[in-house]
Amino acid sequence: MESSSINRWFEYESGHAWCESAYKYQTLPYVAEFANTCTNLPIIVLPLVNIMLLRRYLHDVNGGLIFPQLLLTFNGLASTYYHATLNLFGQLVDELSLVWIITVFLVVYIPVMKWFPEKFSKRLTLVRWVVLIVTALVSGLCFLEPNLNAIALMLFSIPAAVVINYEGKQSGIPDIESFPSRILALWGVAFSFWFADRLLCDFWLYLGTPYLHALFHLLAGLAGYTIFIMFSMIDIESRTKTHKYTAAVRYFPGKNGSIFSFPYISLKERSQ
């Protein structure tokens, strides 16, 4: 009985299938949802690009910034596994890693967040442990009742959006003034694709285009990456008295900073 229960988590198609699953295994015989699998590549790669560009700052000043970004890469890998197999374990790890990204992000960046009450700064370690313990308890409950995961994500993501908007607008850094609007626009369109794929699948199948969840991956991945760029800039600026670096946001391709361009941080040593 116990073995059967464990096997249920790893069985092909034991998790939620998306609209593309109507064409499952047609592109590759061992990949259930090909487009949904491949579009995780930016989620895997972009955080590693930011880590590489900030490697000197991470080494010299604040190495903790690496953890939430590695978690985003892990989420991309988990999502790749989930959409390739559609098993329940992959689905839960994919979704729970998003909860942990938000948690670890908060733990790492909370010292430079303006909304965090200064009177609690002396109890920062306690606050961090409380956040981690609560998330661990929620994660355990989600394994017992997987449907709780969607509720946990909703409860975590709404205040996260408020914090992103507040911190970006209060940062006083010209390079990231437009980032809250940029992030929320990408996130809003991404989630509209997420809901449309789930609720209107028959319509997309009629049109022969069941790929809205794949577009969700691309836009949500870019939004998540942009969040890390914004808060990396805030961290660098907030600690400017403790290091020798200056940072500026650049864009690829071009320099106009359109919503579909990739922002990145140009890090240089301050001239003596």
UniProtKB/Swiss-Prot annotation:
Cofactor: Zn(2+)
Residues the record lists as binding Zn(2+): H83, H213, H217
Membrane topology: Multi-pass membrane protein
Spans traversing the lipid bilayer: 34-54, 61-81, 96-116, 124-144, 148-168, 183-203, 214-234
Function: Hydrolyzes the sphingolipid ceramide into sphingoid base and free fatty acid. C.elegans contain specific sphingoid bases, which are unique or different in structure compared to the sphingoid bases found in other animals. Two examples of these distinctive compounds are: 15-methylhexadecasphinganine and 15-methylhexadecasphing-4-enine.
Organism: Caenorhabditis elegans
Residues linked to a glycan: N256
Alphabetical keyword list: Glycoprotein, Hydrolase, Lipid metabolism, Membrane, Metal-binding, Transmembrane, Transmembrane helix, Zinc
Reaction equation(s) it catalyzes: an N-acyl-sphingoid base + H2O = a sphingoid base + a fatty acid; an N-acylsphing-4-enine + H2O = sphing-4-enine + a fatty acid; an N-acyl-15-methylhexadecasphing-4-enine + H2O = 15-methylhexadecasphing-4-enine + a fatty acid
A Pfam family: Ceramidase
Protein name per its UniProtKB record: Alkaline ceramidase
Location in the cell: Membrane
Its EC number(s): 3.5.1.23
Similarity annotation: Belongs to the alkaline ceramidase family.
InterPro entries linked to this entry: ACER
